[in-house]
Amino acid sequence: YHIYASNIDGKNSMDLTPFDGVKANFSNLLKDQRDFVIVDLNKNNPEIFEPYKLNIVTGELTQLYKNEDASNPISGYTFDKDGNLKGYTQQEGATNYSLYYRLGENEPFKKMLTTTWQDNFYIAGFDYASGNPHQAYVISNLESNTDELILYDFETNKEIKKVFSN
């Protein structure tokens, strides 16, 4: 798969990911940076995807993180609205997934929890209204037999409240 850009009238089409054998997936739209999107490409290794910031006007790509462990690959990345990598989920072995999170751009990632393939715990989006950059809405079934929407504080690694449960 490739990502293309064109004018609104369909003219001036440009392949933004012109790499043979490389698949491209949209990851994040950056609302406040209209010329940029974050995409996942398997450019360095066909077995694993890594995030890139893509300028949709010029086609310039900037790699944002390296996913170098093919035996325990990163299966998903979480970015904030400014395009900062806040966390990722890494497969560990055949059936476990660990969520890693960092408090700041220059901080190391810390493992927050590990789940199995049967469990859900992933960041749906950050709560920008709270003023706390580490508050996020999480989808989880760890405390229920169905998915719940939870407001979670990653700085304290604790649930703040259940927003919705069915």
Model feature map: region roles:
Residues 1-166:
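Beta-propeller folds
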